[in-house]
């Protein structure tokens, strides 16, 4: 037997995390551990000594993206991100963040194992089924500021709070909101939030 490859599995949902661990342990060259990103807090990076980290792309979303930052700080590009073509924004963030592996959640189990070994060698792995979605993610029409305004609005923040948190005037926030609604082809603010969330841009 060759040298073992240490794998850390990160997922917010216990059942799915356990299923991923069992799948990966079917390969006896993989030494697998698992953790919940939220529960481990800032100590996460020190707690997971591994060669490759397998993480659900949905764990890397959010306005602060703090969990993604901790994982990248610990593993660099040795990330295998699980994603779907329905969420091009999630794919784009993972790719732009330097993750070497992008695996379709609908792919056969052996694809994940292949991806892990590929990334462990420092090589890129991209499921062909995700290629078009990855390109769509690059077409996200909103600026960082417009996306930030919509993200805060999606959390229920009123105009005044958004203005205070982003150090903008209320009028400027309204302008950003109106521009974002127009750019994504939405009917209103609620529709714009739905569109960007469905695409995985927030």
UniProtKB/Swiss-Prot annotation:
It comes from Streptomyces coelicolor (strain ATCC BAA-471 / A3(2) / M145). One of its GO terms (biological process) is regulation of DNA-templated transcription. A transcription factor required for aerial hyphae formation on rich medium. Activates transcription of ramC. Might be part of a two-component regulatory system. Binds the promoter of ramC. Non-phosphorylated protein cooperatively binds multiple sites in the ramC promoter. Has not been seen to autophosphorylate using the small molecule phosphodonors phosphoramidate, acetyl phosphate or carbamoyl phosphate. Changing residue 102 to Y: Restores aerial hyphae formation in ramR deletion mutants, activates RamC expression. PANTHER family: TRANSCRIPTIONAL REGULATORY PROTEIN DESR, TWO-COMPONENT RESPONSE REGULATOR. Residues 159-178 bind DNA. One of its GO terms (molecular function) is DNA binding. This is Response regulator RamR. Changing residue 102 to A/W: Does not restore aerial hyphae formation in ramR deletion mutants, does not activate RamC expression. Has lost cooperative binding to the ramC promoter, binds only the high affinity site, forms homodimers. SUPFAM superfamilies: C-terminal effector domain of the bipartite response regulators, CheY-like. Homodimer, in the absence of phosphorylation. Residues 1-121 are annotated as: Response regulatory. CDD domains: LuxR_C_like, REC_NarL-like. The N-terminal response regulatory domain is atypical as it does not have conserved residues usually found in these domains; it is required for both homodimerization and DNA-binding. The C-terminal domain does not bind DNA alone, nor does it form homodimers. At very high concentrations overexpression of the C-terminal domain has a dominant-negative effect on DNA-binding by the whole protein. The keyword Phosphoprotein applies. The gene is ramR.
């Amino acid at each position: 037997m060759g040298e073992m490859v240490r794998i850390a599995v990160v997922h917010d949902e216990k059942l799915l995390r356990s299923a991923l661990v069992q799948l990966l342990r079917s390969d006896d060259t993989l030494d697998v551990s698992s953790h919940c990103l939220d529960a481990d807090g800032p100590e996460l990076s020190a707690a997971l000594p591994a060669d490759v980290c397998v993480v659900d792309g949905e764990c890397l979303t959010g306005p602060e993206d703090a969990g993604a930052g901790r994982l990248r700080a610990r593993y660099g590009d040795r990330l295998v991100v699980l994603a779907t073509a329905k969420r091009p924004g999630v794919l784009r963030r993972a790719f732009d963040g330097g993750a070497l592996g992008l695996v379709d959640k609908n792919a056969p189990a052996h694809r994940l194992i292949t991806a892990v070994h590929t990334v462990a060698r420092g090589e890129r792995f991209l499921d062909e089924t995700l290629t078009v979605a990855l390109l769509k993610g690059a077409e996200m029409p909103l600026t960082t500021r417009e996306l930030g305004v919509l993200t805060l609005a999606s959390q229920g923040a009123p105009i005044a709070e958004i203005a205070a948190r982003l150090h903008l005037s209320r009028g400027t926030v309204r302008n950003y909101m109106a521009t974002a609604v127009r750019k994504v082809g939405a009917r209103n603010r609620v529709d714009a939030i739905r569109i960007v969330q469905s695409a995985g841009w927030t």
